């Protein structure tokens, strides 16, 4: 069942300050009260989140990478809380209440005070990320985070109703619940190459972004399958295929891998035909697309080794 996924992109080299990043991020996570415990397993997970960020943005200015890395840690812990809250029987309105304060941080000028520590931690990240970044980029990032929040509520509703979404609905929502669009936004932030809306919304560029999202999202579903099936979570491409096509796990896994690989081929074809704008934008767009390639490969390699997915009882 573990056939290799297609990943024709070169292996990445981590940021030269990766070790310092890991130490700083762990200290920030501890200071903000995000750690559920101080077990070696939990600490290893935090270090693995830092390793992912260091490989995904190897050329970033360190302070910007710090903000990205802290967001990664925030996101992984927050995602687990939302998932575990609804899996343990809480109604979607409980998840919505948790998310409400986070939503307020995105829109408000000051830190929200409810549901600490997540709102306070995000407010700290948000203040740092906002410095010196153009308004159109901040609005885009906010929209993508809000779409993720809406996706968390949708998942909670599905769990309450014991509902497995159709493949079509799932794939559409997966583009938001995976948070990949935020990670693509961080490529701009890390490289100081902010692309105007008319560039990222160009149909061909938008399809490059969507295809890259699908590659990373479906790879995540495959690599996290053990974690999610142990949690009885249905929001996974393999599980959706099992349910919709009435096939066994092995066949669904192979189907999901094939869907992933087809998106890789589609992405490779798309990037041969990028539109042109101006000399500066064209250079930045090329760097942006290269950043997506780097991210996909870094995530592929990280997913194989991270304790988040690869412990015997990965949860």
From Swiss-Prot:
Keywords: Lyase, Magnesium, Metal-binding. InterPro entries: Isoprenoid_synthase_dom_sf (IPR008949), Terpene_cyclase-like_2 (IPR034686). Mg(2+) 3 binds at residues 220, 224, 228. Mg(2+) 1 binds at residue 79. Gene3D superfamilies: Farnesyl Diphosphate Synthase. Its cofactor is Mg(2+). A motif (NXXXSXXXE motif) lies at residues 220-228. Mg(2+) 2 binds at residue 79. Binds 3 Mg(2+) ions per subunit. It catalyses: (2E,6E)-farnesyl diphosphate + H2O = 10-epi-cubebol + diphosphate. A motif (DDXXD motif) lies at residues 79-83. One of its GO terms (molecular function) is metal ion binding. Its EC number is 4.2.3.175. PANTHER family: BETA-PINACENE SYNTHASE-RELATED, TERPENE SYNTHASE. Catalyzes the cyclization of farnesyl diphosphate (FPP) to 10-epi-cubebol. Is also responsible for the formation of many other sesquiterpenes, mainly cadalanes and cubebanes, including 1,10-di-epi-cubebol and the cadalanes delta-cadinene, T-cadinol and alpha-cadinol. Belongs to the terpene synthase family. This is 10-epi-cubebol synthase. It comes from Sorangium cellulosum (strain So ce56). The lineage of its organism: Bacteria, Pseudomonadati, Myxococcota, Polyangia, Polyangiales.
């Amino acid at each position: 069942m573990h056939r290799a996924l297609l990943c024709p992109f070169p292996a990445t080299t981590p940021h030269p300050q990766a070790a310092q990043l890991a130490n700083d991020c762990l200290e920030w996570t501890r200071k903000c009260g995000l750690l559920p415990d101080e077990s070696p397993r939990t600490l290893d997970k935090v270090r693995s989140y830092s390793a992912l960020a260091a490989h995904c943005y190897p050329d970033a200015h360190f302070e910007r990478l710090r903000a990205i890395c802290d967001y990664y840690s925030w996101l992984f812990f927050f995602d687990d809380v939302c998932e575990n809250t609804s899996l343990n029987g809480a109604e979607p309105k409980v998840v919505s209440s948790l998310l409400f304060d986070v939503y307020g941080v995105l829109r408000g000028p000051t830190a929200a005070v409810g549901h600490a520590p997540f709102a306070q931690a995000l407010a700290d990240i948000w203040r740092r990320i906002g410095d010196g970044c153009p308004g159109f980029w901040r609005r885009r990032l906010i929209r993508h985070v809000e779409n993720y929040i809406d996706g968390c509520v949708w998942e909670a509703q599905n769990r309450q109703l014991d509902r497995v979404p159709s493949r079509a609905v799932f794939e559409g929502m997966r583009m938001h619940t995976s948070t990949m669009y935020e990670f693509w936004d961080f490529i701009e932030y890390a490289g100081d190459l902010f692309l105007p809306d008319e560039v990222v919304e160009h149909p061909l560029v938008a399809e490059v972004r969507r295809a890259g999202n699908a590659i990373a999202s479906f790879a995540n579903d495959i690599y996290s399958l053990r974690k999610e099936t142990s949690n009885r979570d249905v929001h996974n491409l393999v599980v959706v295929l099992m349910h919709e096509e009435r096939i066994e796990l092995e066949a669904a896994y192979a189907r999901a891998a094939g869907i992933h690989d087809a998106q890789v081929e589609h992405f490779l074809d798309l990037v041969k035909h990028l539109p042109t704008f101006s000399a500066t934008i064209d250079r930045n767009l090329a760097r942006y697309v290269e950043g997506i390639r780097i991210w996909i490969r870094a995530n592929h390699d990280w997913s194989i080794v991270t304790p988040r997915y690869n412990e015997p009882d990965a949860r």
